[in-house]
Design a protein with these regions (language model features):
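Zinc-dependent metalloendopeptidases
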Residues: 1-285
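Disulfide-stabilized extracellular ectodomains of secreted/luminal proteins, especially beta-rich
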Residues: 262-471
Length: 471
């Protein structure tokens, strides 16, 4: 659905609702997606895989927005993004925060909202609280104030509907488009519609948290378009997070304040700083962890990871929660065990194990399951030498070696890191094994060792694998 276009092209008509995205053939999905979100218009002579076709150009535009490798073809990474649940508003220019333009903002500070109907998925009190909390996300950083009305027409009309629901943009059934909203304007402008074929929840990790979906949609109601910053609330793809600890990211704060200015009352008290998105082009970047997974490389920092695909030199950035909903943020270490197709994520005294996207039953567990003593409060880095079956843990300036076969720590460990890996004198911050080499990070510097001989080959910087992709 394309609510912004409705404001500009009121004569547009829609003949039928699209098929659910998860059952749609790849090429049909691509065309439908690009029509909905990138203004693609069908050209009878265009094939989805032909270079320089109108479709290829729109694929490139979509790939650039999401930070994918720009191939202009329907590759697996592009399809994976297309199948993720998202907002129904089209994606705009490729930038951090973005506004609709043409001064599409409210010319007053006091706005009204009305909840026209309710979702049967939640109690009315839970819907009321979710909507109020979502509006307060924006009121907290601007002069805008919201008051609820129970009859008549409000500035922001909130409703739940399925398929054709009274505007020109029918919903598409479960998954796919979750909701859409209209930019500030008279009439339908500012209104937010939620797809009743989705499962909306108050706090559960099942379904979609209404507060998070609504907070995003109200950004549109106030004049923001989509951001290409994967950490922003206004990023088009849905991301689960805990509503009780949600803090509006810096990108969204900058965007909304560019329209309305800051909250003249200031913050209500000391609180967390708005989170920012780490930059792969930062020469001082210190990664939290690095691991391989099924031939790809994953780099972790804060709430984020970069994923370097097998056929691409361009890493794709996303929130960890988008990839592994059950995983913690700000992990300490990560390591892949290829023999069991598992990746382990460490934080404090706990370890999580995932197979693909799924949390393995019985996890998280204590790191003592890897033989680490109670004195170890956290792991700084880990790597597995599959040849020898030894899992190496870096803790402060000490190294522990865990024998996968006997499930015990090797005799003679812990020992100083530089006894095994000469020249590493500082604290190890991340490590991984790749094609027979150990890559060990100490701050922004990376050491390349032969895993067999432990001989140092090269000193590199973070950008050797995590390439800067600033356009």
């Amino acid at each position: 659905s394309s609510p912004l276009v409705l404001l500009l092209c009121p004569l547009l008509t829609v003949l039928c609702a699209p098929l659910p995205w998860e059952t749609m053939p790849d090429e049909e999905l691509a065309k439908s997606y690009l029509k909905s979100f990138y203004n693609f218009r069908e050209d009878n002579g265009s094939a989805v895989r032909r270079a320089l076709s109108p479709l290829s150009q729109k694929l490139s535009e979509m790939q650039r927005f999401f930070g994918l490798e720009i191939t202009g073809t329907l590759d697996p990474a592009t399809l994976e993004v297309m199948r993720k649940p998202r907002c129904g508003v089209p994606d705009g220019k490729i930038s951090a925060f973005s506004i609709f333009g043409d001064n599409l903002k409210w010319q007053k500070k006091n706005l009204t909202y009305r909840i026209e109907n309710y979702s049967p998925d939640m109690s009315q009190a839970e819907v009321d609280q979710s909507i109020e909390m979502a509006l307060q996300v924006w009121a907290g950083v601007t002069p805008l104030r919201f008051s609820r009305v129970f009859s008549g027409t409000a500035d922001i009309m909130v409703s739940f509907g399925r398929q054709s629901h009274g505007d020109l943009y029918p919903f598409d059934g479960p998954q796919g488009t979750l909701a859409h909203a209209f930019a500030p304007a008279p009439g339908i402008g500012g209104d937010a519609h939620f797809d009743e074929d989705e499962l909306f929840t108050f706090r559960s990790e099942e379904g979609y948290v209404l507060f998070l979906v609504a907070a995003h949609e109200f950004g549109h109601s106030l004049g923001l378009s989509h951001s290409s910053d994967p950490g922003a609330l206004m990023f088009p793809i849905y991301t689960h997070s805990n509503p009780d600890s949600f803090v509006l990211p810096q990108d969204d704060v900058r965007g909304i304040q560019s329209l309305y200015g800051p909250n003249p009352e200031g913050p209500l008290g000391p609180g967390p700083e708005p989170p920012t998105t780490p930059d792969a082009c930062d020469s001082k970047l210190v990664l939290d962890a690095v691991t391989t997974l099924r031939g790809e490389i994953y780099f972790f920092k804060g709430r984020f990871l970069w994923r370097r695909h097998t056929q691409s030199s361009i890493p794709q950035q996303s929130l960890i929660a988008n990839f592994w909903p059950g995983a913690p943020d700000e992990i300490d270490a990560a390591v892949e065990r290829r023999s069991s197709d598992r990746v382990f994520l460490f934080k404090d005294r706990q370890v999580w194990a995932f197979r693909g996207y799924d949390l393995v039953a019985g996890y998280p567990k204590s790191i003592s399951s890897f033989g680490l003593p109670g004195a170890v409060k956290k792991v700084d880095a880990a790597l597995l030498d599959e040849e020898s079956g030894k899992m190496l843990f870096f803790v402060d300036r000490m190294l522990y070696s865990y024998d996968e076969a006997t499930e015990t720590l090797e005799p003679g460990f812990p020992q100083r890191v530089d006894r095994t890996f000469p020249d590493i004198l500082g604290r190890v911050t991340a490590a991984f094994e790749y094609r027979g080499f150990a890559y060990i990070y100490s701050g922004p510097v990376m050491f390349e060792y032969s895993l067999g001989s432990k001989r140092l080959f090269r000193l590199l910087d973070n950008s050797y694998f995590l390439t800067c992709t600033r356009f």
